[in-house]
């Protein structure tokens, strides 16, 4: 299950995490964001990646800091740094490829 993060919890939940973290930048009014959410849950489960969500309407500063111009935007963080990103609701395999996760066994 995804964890909602705010500017106050982002450093602890994402930047200081020991494992890779997939950050889903989304909004309540965004249909494609809701459509891709279960796909992201599966990717996180299959690849042992922590999944967190940032509501861009509530956390505009975070969205600006990471250059989020459209949603959904998913950014994979490794060792506290953005490692890969994908924009838009895409099929599971395309998201995995874009994030460099490969195919789960």
Where do the protein language model's features map onto the residues?
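A short beta-strand-turn-helix
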Residues: 3-21, 60-61
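Thiol-based oxidoreductase modules, predominantly thioredoxin-like and allied folds used
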Residues: 5-6, 25, 37-61, 68
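Short pre-active-site segment immediately N-terminal to redox-active cysteine/selenocysteine motifs
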Residues: 18-19, 25-29, 70
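Structural signature of beta-strand start/N-cap positions in the alpha/beta core
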Residues: 19, 48-50, 72
